[in-house]
Amino acid sequence: MGLVNIMRFITFAYIICGGFILTRTSGTSASASPATPTTNTGEGTSSPVTPTYTTSTDSNNSTATNNSTDVNGTEATPTPSHPHSHENTITCTNSLISVPYYTSVTINCSTTVSVNHSEYRLEIHLNQRTPFSDTPPGDQENYVNHNATKDQTLLLFSTAHSSAKSRRVGQLGVIPDRLPKRQLFNLPAHTNGGTNFPLNIKSIDWRTAGVYVWYLFAKNGSLINSTSVTVLTYNAPLMDLSVHPSLKGENHRAVCVVASYFPHNSVKLRWYKNAKEVDFTKYVTNASSVWVDGLITRISTVSIPADPDEEYPPSLRCSIEWYRDEVSFSRMAKAGTPSVFVAPTVSVNVEDGAAVCTAECVPSNGVFVSWVVNDHLPGVPSQDVTTGVCSSHPGLVNMRSSRPLSEENGEREYNCIIEGYPDGLPMFSDSVVYDASPIVEDMPVLTGIIAVTCGAAALALVVLITAVCFYCSKPSQVPYKKADF
């Protein structure tokens, strides 16, 4: 009896211990299982968070659900779906590449799964875009780019397009534009079961800059995974300043040229007069142009009225800020002072068988007289002399130049031109017409002879008339005979 009770007690204790051990084991397993992440919905409750996977992102933050086209306009629409596995991923060595213009770039991307044509399809797309299209840091450029194509998505490569099929769907990896058709990319090889899909871009420019996206699709067309690489390019501007000479009292003018830069809208330009910023809306005009290579050239012209109270011409400075990207920029500036000239007074006369040119208020150095006769440069040298100082403008002088008249018959135009002034100023000149024909030269002598002859004839006529009148005024006498006495 006692033995039976002891056996029952041992059995009961064994059952209790076994249940306790099972309970501890279940609790430990439950505590070790991963909890579902939650997020606050903003209403005091939490909801589970479903893991998401990044697809593609273009300049407008669009995903892989956007339609894309190949070079022939055929739509290729990736179908979004949840990834089949966390391990079926695409990795690239870089997610952002920024290189100088015309640089060759290779993007190395690989998959963790062998892309068998019977199970998967891999595609490479290019989302063309222009940097700073949303919030450009530079000035707005007023030009029309006839070369550029609209931002679009292009299909560059697909493992579903074998060499035999590619002849039917068109050539991939070629961007249509006004330039001659040429291969811009070295595309991956069509290898069944491959894992490496490098893309070589032969030249990064306005056509090939953008977001490149690698898509991995399942056999049924659902999207498994994707990754994107943003490729940016830049080209530093060349700057030149030309300050134009001006006449006293006229506007001061200067032209600033910022050439061959990229990206678009990446240059901020300002003008300064003696370190004071110039009003852009009143005194500055701008023009921009884009060349066939996609680089931009900007021409800015400033024209400021002369201040009569200023003793000296002002300093004009063109300053630019060029933004290579959203965070990197550099400054450049050039300055110059315009040369101000007094307009000379030029006159030409004929004196003593020579054409004489007088120029008043000209610079004492670098200025000379050039003669042109009937639009031809004469072979006869001229004689230039300084006759004195300009009374109205100290520091300037008066000049006199003469040259013999032509001995040829007919009219001749003698044009006196003051040379030596810089380009950009008007031409200072004067002219006179002289006829050297013999009939014209003998006319004064003939006129004198005729005048003397007429005078002598008139005098003789007067004497004759006077004599006749005197004779007629005497009393008449009757003749007599000697016999009458």
From Swiss-Prot:
- For this protein, the parts annotated as crossing the membrane are 445-468
- Cysteine pairs forming cystine bridges in this chain are 92-109, 256-318, 357-416, 361-390
Keyword tags: Disulfide bond, Glycoprotein, Host-virus interaction, Immunoglobulin domain, Inhibition of host complement factors by virus, Membrane, Signal, Transmembrane, Transmembrane helix, Viral attachment to host adhesion receptor, Viral attachment to host cell, Viral immunoevasion, Virion, Virus entry into host cell
Biological process (GO) annotations held by this record are: adhesion receptor-mediated virion attachment to host cell; symbiont entry into host cell; symbiont-mediated suppression of host complement activation
Which stretches face the Virion surface side? 33-444
Q: Which residues form the Ig-like domain?
A: 237-330
* Record's keyword annotation contains Magnesium: no
A Pfam family name for this chain?
Answer: Marek_A
Q: Does the keyword 4Fe-4S apply?
A: no
Instruction: Tell me the subunit arrangement.
Output: Interacts with host complement component C3; this interaction inhibits host immune response by disregulating complement cascade.
This chain belongs to the protein called Envelope glycoprotein C
Species, as recorded:
Equine herpesvirus 4 (strain 1942) (EHV-4)
Encoding gene (name)? gC
